[in-house]
């Protein structure tokens, strides 16, 4: 006969660890220049973020989108991908025709920054000059 597991150990196996994740999207330069509106980005993220395959259920799943002066923060207590946040930010830029001038760059472990593309002044920097 196989012994049954104790009730306490079964409960421990079912209990899940709470995950506290916070990801930021820093948009300082584009917001100061008036190219990007931070409120529009927040509304877009609130509308488009999917949790468990459904949009519009952020509050029920403990996911919050917060706005500071030039920063959007996504705070989640359920598993949430930083890469998904980058995907949605790029989608927002494309939808507003800003993707040609702005890019999304990872600054550190939990922060993205929206930056301008750096375009070199010299077209052929490596060619021979006559």
From Swiss-Prot:
GO terms for biological process: cytoplasmic translation. InterPro entries: Ribosomal_eL22, Ribosomal_eL22_sf. The keyword ATP-binding does not apply. Pfam families: Ribosomal_L22e (PF01776). The keyword Ribonucleoprotein applies. Gene3D superfamilies: 3.30.1360.210. GO terms for molecular function: RNA binding; structural constituent of ribosome. GO terms for cellular component: ribonucleoprotein complex; ribosome. Keywords: Ribonucleoprotein, Ribosomal protein. Belongs to the eukaryotic ribosomal protein eL22 family. PANTHER family: 60S RIBOSOMAL PROTEIN L22, FI24544P1-RELATED. This is Large ribosomal subunit protein eL22. It comes from Caenorhabditis elegans.
